[in-house]
Amino acid sequence: MTKNNEAGWNLDHSYTTLPQSFYTEIPPTPVSSPELVKLNHSLAISLGFHPEELKKEAEIAIFAGNALPEGAHPLAQAYAGHQFGHFNMLGDGRALLIGEQITPSGKRFDIQLKGSGPTPYSRRGDGRAALGPMLREYIISEAMYALDIPTTRSLAVVTTGEPTYRETKLPGAILTRVASSHIRVGTFQYAAARGSIEDLQSLADYTIKRHYPEIEAHENRYTALLQEVIKKQASLIAKWQLVGFIHGVMNTDNITISGETIDYGPCAFMDNYDQGTVFSSIDTQGRYAYGNQPYMAAWDLARLAESLIPILHEDEEEALKIAQDEISKFSVQYENQWFLGMKKKLGLFSNEEQDQSLIEQLLKMMEKFKADYTNTFRSLTLNTIENTALFESPEFKEWYKLWQSRLERQEESKENAYEMMKNNNPSIIPRNHRVEEALEAAVTSGDYSVMEKLLEALSNPYAYSADQEDYCAPPAPTNRPYRTFCGT
């Protein structure tokens, strides 16, 4: 481990202790004229960096892949993945892990350059990224962090001064992504597909040491690892559902072992409540629709369990039984987390038998009347029942009476109930049309002020402040259906 004290680099590279089949060492491809367009000050400080130093030319060169900090060990990670149900051997096709930053508190975070050039895993891709998708990842990942949802984060975005060609010519950019690690379900699939039990065991041991050291002494630590990942993903997916987040591409290579949300390509937030909501242009069958996300998470975790079978038990039948037993627990864990979250969204402290029915009735009405998901809960939180089709309906008025009497029956005061609702119902989400507005200004005009204002509003989604009002409105009904596209 080496240290550059001027900017605060303090890099280690524990991933290289794994067998070399898990990665390829390769330097980033330099770019012509990098320019820093966004730096995450608060994240930089928490990682042990000095933000003002990071704005200097020498550090911008690092974010661009034109230079490396002391202790850097750039590598592309190998992994596999089921992409829309089809298995492929994959890997970092346009990203490089330059090292793991050790923070002042001793925590370890991957520092990855996304869009840093081709790698052996690029599969005919150019290894580059466009400015729009990189800024989009910055905005959405920071919004998720503010919503208290586990996520990778964005430290910096630099433009490269070079065009990137997709459907059209676009300005190129590189995002510096920060993650607890980039170990995925697909990393374990890769190890299992190669057929080396020793390599699979090495990966599992490394993952336990890095993410779940408390289970190292467990009688069957590999079963315990599976249990921990299931627990983390059940919690994560419940949090997604509770705020109306739709990931869009829940392939196994986008499911992290740490339980963080990763890959903000075709993601979006739901406006009108609809279980079938899909935004991704490539998800033509609705595989990853809003209502399918819990089921797809269980499917992805079953692929992790399959990969672990060779090390779960020496007897294959027993290993298979262990895997099946553990996967069967996901749905209960998810349902419990989601139900607890929905109760908080409605200010329910105690438990009553009809709570499930109360929640389901509201959601059915919201779907029937195409009610805005975020704003419905926002209105209930503020107790301002606005003139909408949902709130004007006789069935809602009946439901509202039931809900109010339910609040009155619990020991906690209504004031406390509404306060809990305020802490669990965001006033603001990154509305798709407002994100696009910010990206349009930045990419076409070089005007980052629209994005800065949006980021400021999103930084405290539970504030219910006056300056957020402008960002609460859903898109105009005349707007065509929103579609998202994978940045690659």
UniProtKB/Swiss-Prot annotation:
Needed co-factor(s): Mg(2+); Mn(2+)
Binding site for Mg(2+): 254, 263
Entry EC no(s): 2.7.7.-, 2.7.7.108
GO molecular function: AMPylase activity; ATP binding; magnesium ion binding
Gene (UniProt): ydiU
Keyword Transmembrane carried by entry: no
Pfam families linked: SelO
Catalytic reaction(s) noted: L-seryl-[protein] + ATP = 3-O-(5'-adenylyl)-L-seryl-[protein] + diphosphate; L-threonyl-[protein] + ATP = 3-O-(5'-adenylyl)-L-threonyl-[protein] + diphosphate; L-tyrosyl-[protein] + ATP = O-(5'-adenylyl)-L-tyrosyl-[protein] + diphosphate; L-histidyl-[protein] + UTP = N(tele)-(5'-uridylyl)-L-histidyl-[protein] + diphosphate
Keywords: ATP-binding, Magnesium, Manganese, Metal-binding, Nucleotide-binding, Nucleotidyltransferase, Transferase
Protein name (record): Protein nucleotidyltransferase YdiU
Family from the record: Belongs to the SELO family.
Higher taxonomy: Bacteria, Bacillati, Bacillota, Bacilli, Bacillales
Annotated binding of ATP, by residue: 91, 93-94, 114, 126-127, 177, 184, 263
Signal peptide location: none
Coiled coil: none
Functional description taken from the UniProt entry: Nucleotidyltransferase involved in the post-translational modification of proteins. It can catalyze the addition of adenosine monophosphate (AMP) or uridine monophosphate (UMP) to a protein, resulting in modifications known as AMPylation and UMPylation.
Catalytic residues (UniProt): 253 (proton acceptor)
